[in-house]
Amino acid sequence: MEFVKLQCNICFSVAEIKNYFMQPIDRLTMIPVLELDTCKHQLCSMCIRKIRKRKKTPCPLCRVESLHFNVYSINRNVVDVIKCSVTSVAQWNKINGNFDAASLASVLFEKSLLDDAEDSNNAANSDDTMLSESQAILKKLQADIAEQTQLNIKRQLDLNKLQQTSVFMQEKLHRIKNDYNNMHKSFKELQLKRISTEKALKSLNDDYAKLAAKNARLSNENKVLSNKNIELIKHKNLLQNEYTTLQSYKCITNSTITTNVTINVD
């Protein structure tokens, strides 16, 4: 990325940051957008100063109050974070006109100025250094590409293995599903058989109850008939005794009559 544009979330001021990664000399970069320490939302220094209330700055996006803000400074591979109090932001100028940032920097930091000629000489003298660094970067990129290629091959092998495992699991799942369907079908059949058996058993129980009731009725009738039979036997015996008595009486009577007739004849 050659450059990036940052924008304040409140006043929408824009700052552009250029990339000096391939330059052989150190490049100092201060990110102009500031970060509130508590909620991490980004504002410009002017907005922080204007919305500050006493020693705190309420974030206009989330209303969280912050006592400090962070400034980020970049120097090649080193990133420094500067934690500042919100009360340390103050307006420096008192005029209404716009400033030329380069002219202002040349005035404020005159002792740190680096002229273009010296910068060009340093750049010319460092061509070999830049070439060697570029070659080192190229070798590193080639090594990274080779490592990434090996990693991609390994991942492809792992992916193929996972695909085979997935196919095996799908086949196993299909078999399990078929077994489940067959078991469900068998369960339905057994359930229907159970219902039929329960109906048949209920019918048998009903028939048994009817037969038991009929048997009880017949037993009662048999008991009544048995009692009647006993009464009839008793009555028969009584009649038999009376008949025997009558027969005996008849024999005695006949014998008496015969005796009387014999006497009369004589």
From Swiss-Prot:
GO terms for cellular component: host cell nucleus. SMART domains: RING. GO terms for molecular function: zinc ion binding. SUPFAM superfamilies: RING/U-box. It comes from the Viruses. Keywords: Host nucleus, Metal-binding, Zinc, Zinc-finger. PROSITE patterns: ZF_RING_1, ZF_RING_2. Pfam families: zf-C3HC4. A zinc finger (RING-type) spans 8-63. Plays a role in the proper expression of late and very late genes. This is Zinc finger protein CG30. The gene is CG30.
